[in-house]
């Protein structure tokens, strides 16, 4: 191969070779792309162990589906990073679903002595405070918070839904969370 590692033409050729089952091509493809894939996955998952495991799953999928790659639909790196992002987000969702299942099971199977009336009053007060603080945000900040936290969307999905740049969404979320924290701390 000629040119710098990771060039689209080089990766294209490697994917064709991987589709034919050539292990050396797979090793070269991995060497050229693993840093970017792992970096993307680690940013989404924020856990080294899960990131390594997910990266391994992604490359296993590359080995199995290299023949499905269509060069007319995008570059090999875009195909790979899209696959990586989807797999990482799926992992986040699976972990969240597992945690929620465990929480529901634990809540349903633990009988704690508690004052139901007091707990209900406290929960109602907390809900009221959160609603008041949400009302103090700008409409765009509130919309971002609602989509991400109540709608379960990732920042990228919020960006797509609102047709707004991802960095703008991140800024709005940061400002909104800071505003909520300040409001809740003050009340």
UniProtKB/Swiss-Prot annotation:
One Pfam entry name: Sigma70_r2
UniProt xrefs under Gene3D superfamilies: 1.10.1740.10, Winged helix-like DNA-binding domain superfamily/Winged helix DNA-binding domain (1.10.10.10)
Residues covered by region (Sigma-70 factor domain-4): 133-182
Alphabetical keyword list: DNA-binding, Sigma factor, Transcription, Transcription regulation
Keyword Transcription regulation annotated: yes
Transcription regulation among keywords: yes
Domain comment (free text): The sigma-70 factor domain-2 mediates sequence-specific interaction with the -10 element in promoter DNA, and plays an important role in melting the double-stranded DNA and the formation of the transcription bubble. The sigma-70 factor domain-2 mediates interaction with the RNA polymerase subunits RpoB and RpoC. The sigma-70 factor domain-4 contains a helix-turn-helix (H-T-H) motif that mediates interaction with the -35 element in promoter DNA. The domain also mediates interaction with the RNA polymerase subunit RpoA. Interactions between sigma-70 factor domain-4 and anti-sigma factors prevents interaction of sigma factors with the RNA polymerase catalytic core.
Function summary: Sigma factors are initiation factors that promote the attachment of RNA polymerase to specific initiation sites and are then released. Extracytoplasmic function (ECF) sigma factors are held in an inactive form by an anti-sigma factor until released by regulated intramembrane proteolysis.
Subunit annotation: Interacts transiently with the RNA polymerase catalytic core formed by RpoA, RpoB, RpoC and RpoZ (2 alpha, 1 beta, 1 beta' and 1 omega subunit) to form the RNA polymerase holoenzyme that can initiate transcription. Interacts (via sigma-70 factor domain 4) with anti-sigma-K factor RskA.
Note: Extracytoplasmic function (ECF) sigma factors are held in an inactive form by an anti-sigma factor until released by regulated intramembrane proteolysis (RIP). RIP occurs when an extracytoplasmic signal triggers a concerted proteolytic cascade to transmit information and elicit cellular responses. The membrane-spanning anti-sigma factor is first cut extracytoplasmically (site-1 protease, S1P), then within the membrane itself (site-2 protease, S2P, Rip1), while cytoplasmic proteases finish degrading the regulatory protein, liberating SigK.
Protein name, per record: ECF RNA polymerase sigma factor SigK
Organism from which the protein derives: Mycobacterium ulcerans (strain Agy99)
Gene expressing this chain: sigK
């Amino acid at each position: 191969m000629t040119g710098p590692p990771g060039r689209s033409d080089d990766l294209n050729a490697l994917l064709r070779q991987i589709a034919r089952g050539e292990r050396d091509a797979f090793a070269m493809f991995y060497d050229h792309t693993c840093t970017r894939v792992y970096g993307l996955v680690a940013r989404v998952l924020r856990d080294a162990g899960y990131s390594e495991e997910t990266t391994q799953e992604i490359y296993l999928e590359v080995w199995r589906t290299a023949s499905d790659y269509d060069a007319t639909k995008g570059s090999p790196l875009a195909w790979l990073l899209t696959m990586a992002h989807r797999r990482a987000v799926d992992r986040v969702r699976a972990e969240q679903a597992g945690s929620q299942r465990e929480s529901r099971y634990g809540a349903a199977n633990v009988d704690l002595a508690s004052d139901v009336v007091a707990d209900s009053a406290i929960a109602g007060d907390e809900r009221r405070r959160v609603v008041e603080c949400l009302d103090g945000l700008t409409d765009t900040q509130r919309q971002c918070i609602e989509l991400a936290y109540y709608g379960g969307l990732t920042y990228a999905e919020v960006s797509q839904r609102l047709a707004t740049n991802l960095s703008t969404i991140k800024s709005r979320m940061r400002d909104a969370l800071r505003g909520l924290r300040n409001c809740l701390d003050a009340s």
